[in-house]
């Protein structure tokens, strides 16, 4: 291709590309509502949803905004995922262990006592097939699962004596969800 032909074709391509730009900017703004399972007082955890909201708005030039609501402002905190499933809100920020009562499989997507640490959980999720398994599971609830943080392993307890055998657990109190105490 000679120089004149190249310049001609490049010019035509430039005009066509410039003509399509207004169509992109003419798209309607997207506004979502996010229900959190956490109160504003838990600023580290609740703040994570606010940070995601700000980053999405910044990355899209304000064309996609997510309004974050604390637990109880739209639905009770433990019903955030149900609100997404039912179409009450567009998305939620929650912890899967709140939904053990629906299915114990939710345990694999979050921190639980004696479970994986943060690095192990992330490795499984992002490199060990965990994301695909969790998405398949969440599809049953009409929800798409996106991990958005990791609080690390949940402690089973702090004890005055060393735990060496199962018998050492007898009579100890644990920090675990009420609905799953009997299973541990």
PLM features per residue range, with description:
Residues 33-50, 71-75:
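Extracytoplasmic "Venus flytrap"
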Residues 53-54, 85, 95-184:
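Contiguous mixed-secondary-structure segments that line small-molecule binding/active-site clefts
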Residues 21-37, 50, 57-65, 139, ...:
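Immediate post-signal peptide segment of exported/extracytoplasmic ligand-binding proteins
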Residues 42-67, 129, 181-184:
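Short, polar/charged alpha-helical segment
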């Amino acid at each position: 291709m000679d120089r004149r032909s190249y310049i001609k074709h490049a010019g035509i391509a430039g005009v066509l590309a410039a003509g399509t730009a207004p169509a992109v900017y003419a798209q309607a703004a997207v506004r979502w509502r996010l229900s959190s399972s956490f109160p504003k007082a838990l600023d580290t955890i609740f703040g994570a949803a606010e940070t995601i909201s700000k980053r999405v708005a910044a990355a899209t030039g304000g064309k996609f905004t997510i309004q974050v609501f604390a637990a109880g402002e739209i639905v009770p905190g433990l019903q955030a995922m149900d609100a997404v499933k039912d179409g009450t809100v567009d998305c939620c920020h929650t912890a899967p262990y709140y939904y053990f009562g629906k299915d114990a499989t939710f345990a694999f997507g979050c921190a639980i006592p004696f479970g994986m640490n943060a690095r192990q959980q992330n490795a499984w999720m992002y490199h060990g097939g965990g994301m695909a398994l969790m998405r398949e599971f969440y599809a049953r609830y009409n929800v798409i699962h996106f991990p958005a943080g990791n609080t690390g392993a949940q402690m089973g307890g702090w004890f005055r004596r060393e735990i060496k055998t199962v018998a050492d657990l007898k009579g100890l109190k644990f920090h675990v969800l009420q609905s799953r105490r009997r299973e541990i």
